[in-house]
UniProtKB/Swiss-Prot annotation:
This is Uridylate kinase. InterPro entries: AceGlu_kinase-like_sf (IPR036393), Asp/Glu/Uridylate_kinase (IPR001048), Uridylate_kinase (IPR011817), Uridylate_kinase_bac (IPR015963). The gene is pyrH. UMP binds at residues 51, 71, 132-139. It catalyses: UMP + ATP = UDP + ADP.
Length: 237
């Protein structure tokens, strides 16, 4: 199966590479190169990016900030990442638009669903920033929401690991990777893939999720082509 319209979820942490903070330009360039090849092949691609490389709302809340305030700061961090991604993509020859859920007309378009879909149809990449514009919702949930809104075929969750494991592979040498999971497997097993709201949204709208390693060059293209990489979450076969 080749996917024609994809929602790619990138974590903020992925953008910082091996650094402890911020954005690694080499990672941005690598992502842009992979995305350019996918778009050149005719796939329509939208991106939701997190902000954890700059600020995490939950961490701010744990440190004493009001949760809603901390989440708004996190949303602004995602816009910094979105604009950086736009720059990298356009340098790679990919026409890109940033749309934000909080109006910032000097640097981005406001999120307008129909306009986003027209951009995709014209071969442009759309990067969604500022989460969904509301506190208490993660960028994973935003990815599921935007995927449903733009009628995406699939959500790609590109991470630092090559799939979903039964336990943390960084801590357990005997961790087993799941090739296929149902939405209910993830929800009932409380597997650390996406938060339960994001999984439930994908389940309700029958949007499959593919989890794979972002740092393996060409993996975005392999996932688009439907190659069996990473872990796939969906309805029972």
């Amino acid at each position: 199966m080749t996917y024609s319209r994809v929602l790619l979820k990138l974590s903020g942490e992925a953008l910082m590479g091996t650094q402890g903070y911020g954005i690694d330009p080499a990672i941005v360039n690598s992502i842009a190169s992979d995305v350019a090849k996918v778009v050149a092949g005719g796939t329509e691609l939208a991106i939701v990016v997190g902000g954890g490389n700059i600020f995490r709302g939950l961490k701010g809340s744990a440190a004493g900030m009001e949760r809603a305030t901390a989440d708004y700061v996190g949303m602004l961090a995602t816009v910094m990442n979105a604009i950086t991604l736009q720059d990298g993509l356009e340098r790679a020859g990919v026409p890109t638009r940033v749309q934000t859920a909080i109006a910032m007309q000097e640097v981005a378009e406001p999120y307008i669903r129909r306009k986003a879909m027209r951009h995709l149809e014209k071969g442009r990449v759309v990067v969604f920033g500022a989460g969904c514009g509301n506190p208490f919702f993660t960028t994973d949930t935003t990815a599921a929401l935007r995927a449903a809104e733009i009628n995406a075929d699939v959500v790609f969750k590109a991470t630092k690991v090559d799939g979903v494991y039964d336990k943390d592979p960084a801590k357990h040498a005997d961790a087993v990777k799941h090739a296929h999971l149902t939405y209910q497997d993830v929800l009932s097993g409380e597997l650390a893939v996406m938060d339960s709201t994001a999984i439930a949204l994908c389940k309700d709208n029958n949007i499959p999720i593919v989890v794979f390693n972002l740092f393996e060059p060409g993996n975005i293209g392999r996932a688009v082509a439907g190659e069996p990489i990473g872990s796939r979450i969906g309805n029972p076969a």
